[in-house]
Amino acid sequence: MKFTDGQWMLQPGVAAHYAAEAYEVQAHEDRLVVLATTRPIKHRGDTLQGPTLTVTLTSPLPGVIRVAVEHYAASSPPRLHIPMVGAGRPAVQVAETETHVSLTSGPLSVDVKKGEGWSLVFREGERVLTKSDWRSLGYIQWGAKGNHVHEQLTLSVGENVYGLGERFTPWVKNGQVVENTNKDGGTACEQGYKSVPFYLTNRGYGVLVDEAGPVSFEVGSEKVARVQFSREGESLDYCVIAGPTPKDVLRRLTALTGRAPLPPAWSFGLWMTTSFTTKYDEATATHFIDEMARRELPLSVFHFDCFWMREFQWCDFEWDHRGFPDPEAMLARLHAKGLKISLWINPYVAQKSPLFAEVVKQGYFIRRDNGLTYQTDLWQPGMAIVDFTNPAAKAWYQGHLRRLLATGADCFKTDFGERIPSEGVVYHDGSDPVEMHNLYALQYNEAVFELLQEVQGRDAIVFARSSYASGQRFPVHWGGDCWSTFESMAESLRGGLSLTTCGFAFWSHDIGGFEGRPPPAVYKRWIQFGLMSSHSRLHGSSSYRVPWLVDEESCEVLRTFTRLKHQLMPYLYAKAHEATQTGVPLMRAMLLEHPDDPACATLDRQYQLGESLLVAPVFTESGEVDVYLPGSEGSGAWTHLLTGEKKAGGRWSREQHGFLGMPLYVAPGSVIAWGAETERPDYDYARGTVLRVFELADGASAPFTIVGAEGEVAARGTVTRTGRRYIAEVGEGALRDWALDVDGRRSPPLAQGGTLAWEDV
């Protein structure tokens, strides 16, 4: 939201009161409390009338400083905040001089200037990260538009801003206005299903605005050298998070807001769905599954979308027996084929649902402020919305899902959760509906994930569309409704990179696009992109996404890249496990891996899976693609995973690829654990493993880790090169029937033992 009109003027009707001086600073053992006046205090008369702001500086985690700004303390209802499961009270250091007071937490400090001339300076060591200074912190009065608190933090020359949730606009957010409100808008607009009021910069710090309700970000779009964030109300809280690297920022962010548990290994395989409004029944599903098997197309999960239930009745949690006469027997047959089953749900109950009257009577829906049930025709006619702030409503909802799990479902696609009313409604626990709008997605997904963990244990997984800050605790998430075009494929990737830059470890998208019918080139290129993502799902709206309906070559592309992903699973699953321990996502923007390479600061058409594998999807019908390989002179060559071609880093190249190829490069000095299985993602990663060594320098060592399908470390060790001699040593766990591979030359396998020495001749 813009409050100014250019550099000097205010918007008509705006009265702005900016922090002008730190009139008083109270230093406590664990905090600083600053009385910020909005005018310089020259004499006693200046202390009368006009607002003051109380600014409290604390630390919830080493390397994180929280700034809580408050105008009126007692005239607003209790506020909701982002769940911070890791918040504590770490030891801080408070120091005071004649002119400044500072608070230090870990490597991060904030200096408060005493007296006239408002200034908060955030430093990591001696390096200034960002500042709140002249006309940065303000209290705004705007008549019918309400009162607002805003902060503006400075941007340095060349500083880029990233994140702010799943945003499909350009990955670098400078110049954009971002409204932190979940909306069901699709990927072709500025709205987002998963708002996260957090941004990361290439200067090595992040900012998390700790607000549940709407926050408006002006990213260099009101004051070009500042990020402004504001909310309506009498207060504003935010946290500055230290690096120094982007990965360090994400480690601290997720230590504060929570990390994802490890998804089951089977979930990394190929998912296929019925699509949305297509005509389908048991025969359709069975035909698709059998045809996949006949064509030797590996499949791990089959998903039944909305119409597994009867039309007009979502959700009643009952199979439509016209198309699925004996669902329990059907699911047993599908399980016997080695498949997992996913069912579509949403948090609404339509008026025609047999459950509707019961739920109204029990009071389990969100109500209007007159006490009646809130209903709408937007989506299901007459639908009402489950109130998850009511423990009984949550238990009722979980009870229906528990029954579905008992009869053969394995997981749920938790769709919707964005179109939640913000005005004129009442929640069971009295929560402010404005602040609940975004948090609703968290409560919905938490209710489902909590039940899945109880019943399925480590196999718990959702396929969620809506979320909010800290929602990474309930994986997996997908990018929502996209078009079947190259442009939409690219915007989907931008959304994924923005989301994973906010600490979400796992992300997916609809292979082939959701809306429309994908041309063959789009479909095949999206298959490549989809299988080189953390989770991979074929899904559409009004047309099926099975490959043989596109063309025969699509089957070959799908087979090739599904099998490739399966063989990469020992590497990918170790990186997935790493994400659960560190908060660094599996799918990483180039900036995360190469923060010191200026070329990586703006790249949003390629990414890395872990630190070793670079992926550049092809977004052209011709197969032409530009790819940048980071590095500098002497840093070693990147190796194409499929062809073995080597290229020096630190330069761009323009490549041409057929549909069975794409830019997949392995970083120099890497060891990729290569699996023995091509037909399924969940297998013993420590048996038949080949440690593929790429451009390991003479005298250097490279680590490897293999995590078992149950989440345990199966093997950990290093590969060392001395001249032409390579020695792999397993220091923890064990490998069986394993080998080394250097540039396609493979050692004899070692049945057992922790050391494999081989000379590459």
How would you describe each model-predicted region?
Residues T97-T99, T104-G106, G115, G192-S195, ...:
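Short, well-ordered loop/turn elements at secondary-structure boundaries
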Residues G115, Q191-Y193, N202, R231-S235, ...:
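Short, solvent-exposed loop/turn segments at the edges of secondary structure
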Residues F449-I461, S467-W478, E491-G495, L499-H509, ...:
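Catalytic core of carbohydrate-active enzymes
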Residues G50, Q191-G192, L200, F229-R231, ...:
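Active-site-proximal structural scaffolding
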Residues A27-R31, F217, S221-R231, G258-P263, ...:
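Short, compositionally biased low-complexity segments
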Residues L57, P107, F198, M292, ...:
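Conserved, mostly hydrophobic/aromatic
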Residues E70-Y72, P298-L558, E593-P595, L603:
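Aromatic- and carboxylate-enriched substrate-binding clefts and catalytic-loop regions
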Residues M1-R259, A265-S267, T273-S275, Y280-D290, ...:
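N-terminal accessory segment at the very beginning of proteins
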